[in-house]
């Protein structure tokens, strides 16, 4: 299996990693959380500037920590979609420069495919097909992973992503940024049954509800009205109880849909990825429900839930082993359905024919 250096700059983390045989040799992340905290969210222009400042040091540290040099690198992977275009361009430019400088293949990686491959880093023998629940600040999807590069979206949010809802509710409760960890911490002090909040179902034209799609905008509005009702009465807002009730509702909605989807499609394994995969309520609810239905649930370690380059390197290595490489004209895209992943590999670049790697 290929040894791959990867770069990830899709949002506010500047990351580089080296992965070999689904084993992490290094995984370096320069976080910008403290930089964006005063703004209550990620500022794209600020994120791009800090990527430029950090990228060289992060890549150098990844190679140093891996104790590896360029002759041992088989290819360079980079996140190219989806994400903040300015941020993606920093990583893409760095990767292309290294590709030309060291004469290596370029492998563009879809960010969501990276999150799916985070599960392989902890479970190298994970076999397809399986269901992946991707929950992050920008995405909430149920995806059937049929093979490397072959994915089918079965359910998704119709409005806010789960992580986005956490950030917005945290702002309503004056808990700061990022909202996910803040709500998770204070929810432990509250009663998750204190308030009945709407789960957010998607009505179908023919009647009934979509079994796998979600909506969090109504839940967010319900929390807003609840907070305002306490303030209008001049009462203290029960922040811990509201946070616990909100978190419980989100975890319940995601768990119900993931379990039903897995059972309906005959998939025995649910792999969870994305920043919200770190949420304690989601972990507890999904593990309990899955055990009852004799399903296996795989959660990555916390370090692989949030954006990182190890997951990008893992996905890149899988594609490189199959002869999938990207052209130097590879572009940064703000949006791209995961079903179109293979469009990133229109054929091997004439400059870099597919590597003949041993199948160790």
UniProtKB/Swiss-Prot annotation:
Q: Which GO biological-process labels does this protein carry?
A: tRNA threonylcarbamoyladenosine modification
What does the UniProt keyword field contain? Acyltransferase, Cytoplasm, Iron, Metal-binding, Transferase, tRNA processing
Q: Which residues bind substrate?
A: 134-138, 167, 180, 184, 279
Looking up InterPro entries in the UniProt record yields:
ATPase_NBD (IPR043129), Gcp-like_dom (IPR000905), KAE1/TsaD (IPR017861), Peptidase_M22_CS (IPR017860), TsaD (IPR022450)
Q: Does the keyword Iron apply?
A: yes
Record's subcellular location: Cytoplasm
Which GO terms fall under molecular function for this chain's record?
Answer: iron ion binding; N(6)-L-threonylcarbamoyladenine synthase activity
Q: Name one GO cellular component term.
A: cytoplasm
| Known cofactor(s) | Fe(2+)
Q: Which SUPFAM superfamilies does the record cross-reference, listed alphabetically? A: Actin-like ATPase domain
- Which residues hold Fe cation? 111, 115, 307
* EC number, as in UniProt: 2.3.1.234
Please list the reactions this protein catalyses: L-threonylcarbamoyladenylate + adenosine(37) in tRNA = N(6)-L-threonylcarbamoyladenosine(37) in tRNA + AMP + H(+)
State the free-text cofactor note: Binds 1 Fe(2+) ion per subunit.
Function, as annotated, reads: Required for the formation of a threonylcarbamoyl group on adenosine at position 37 (t(6)A37) in tRNAs that read codons beginning with adenine. Is involved in the transfer of the threonylcarbamoyl moiety of threonylcarbamoyl-AMP (TC-AMP) to the N6 group of A37, together with TsaE and TsaB. TsaD likely plays a direct catalytic role in this reaction.
Q: Which family does it belong to?
A: Belongs to the KAE1 / TsaD family.
Q: What protein name is recorded for this chain?
A: tRNA N6-adenosine threonylcarbamoyltransferase
Q: Which gene encodes it?
A: tsaD
């Amino acid at each position: 299996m290929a040894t791959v250096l990867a770069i990830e700059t899709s949002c506010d983390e500047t990351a580089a990693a080296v992965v070999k045989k689904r084993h992490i040799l290094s995984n370096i992340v320069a976080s910008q959380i403290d930089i964006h905290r005063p703004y209550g969210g990620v500022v794209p222009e600020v994120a791009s500037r800090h990527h430029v400042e950090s990228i060289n040091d992060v890549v150098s540290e990844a190679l140093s920590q891996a104790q590896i040099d360029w002759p041992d690198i088989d290819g360079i992977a980079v996140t190219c979609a989806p994400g903040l275009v300015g941020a993606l361009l920093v990583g893409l430019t760095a990767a292309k420069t290294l590709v030309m400088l060291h004469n290596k293949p370029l492998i563009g990686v879809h960010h969501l495919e990276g999150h799916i491959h985070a599960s392989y880093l902890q479970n190298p023998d994970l076999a397809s097909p399986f269901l992946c629940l991707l929950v992050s600040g920008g995405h909430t999807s149920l995806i059937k992973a049929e093979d490397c590069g072959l994915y089918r979206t079965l359910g998704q949010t119709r409005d806010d992503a789960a992580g986005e809802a956490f950030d917005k509710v945290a702002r309503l409760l004056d808990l700061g940024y990022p909202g996910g960890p803040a709500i998770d911490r204070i929810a432990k002090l509250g009663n998750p049954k204190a308030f009945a909040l709407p789960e957010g179902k998607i009505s179908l034209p023919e009647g009934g509800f979509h079994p796998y799609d979600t909506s969090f905008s109504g839940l967010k509005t319900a929390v807003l009205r609840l907070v305002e009702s306490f303030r209008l009465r001049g009462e203290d807002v029960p922040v811990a109880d509201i946070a616990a009730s909100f978190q419980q509702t989100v975890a319940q909605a995601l768990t119900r849909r993931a379990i039903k989807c897995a059972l309906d499609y005959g998939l025995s394994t649910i792999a969870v990825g994305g920043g919200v995969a770190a949420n304690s309520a989601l972990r507890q609810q999904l593990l309990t429900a899955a055990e009852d239905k004799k399903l296996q649930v795989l959660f990555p370690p916390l370090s692989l839930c949030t954006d990182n380059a190890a997951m990008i390197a893992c996905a890149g290595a899988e594609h490189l082993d199959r002869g999938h490489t990207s052209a130097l004209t590879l572009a940064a895209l703000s949006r791209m359905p995961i079903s179109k992943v293979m469009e990133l590999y229109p054929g091997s670049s004439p400059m870099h024919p597919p590597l003949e790697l041993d199948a160790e």
